[in-house]
Amino acid sequence: MAVPFRRTSKMKKRLRRTHFKLNVPGMTECPSCGEMKLSHRVCKACGSYNGKDINVKSN
């Protein structure tokens, strides 16, 4: 198996890992009920999206 020719320095390793972070999801306030919801998704509290009530079918 191949092995690295040179040891990776702490700085190079840390610079590479700066992009391995978690992103905060985009939360907005629902205009209908005021609850916090994910952007571009139906509100879990009241079931509205884009000013319209979305009826979700349940099995």
From Swiss-Prot:
GO terms for cellular component: large ribosomal subunit. The keyword Ribonucleoprotein applies. It holds the Pfam family Ribosomal_L32p. GO terms for biological process: translation. InterPro entries: Ribosomal_bL32, Ribosomal_bL32_bact, Ribosomal_zn-bd. It comes from the Bacteria. One of its GO terms (molecular function) is structural constituent of ribosome. The keyword Ribosomal protein applies. Coiled coil: none annotated. Keywords: Ribonucleoprotein, Ribosomal protein. Belongs to the bacterial ribosomal protein bL32 family. Part of the 50S ribosomal subunit. This is Large ribosomal subunit protein bL32. It comes from Bacillus subtilis (strain 168). The gene is rpmF.
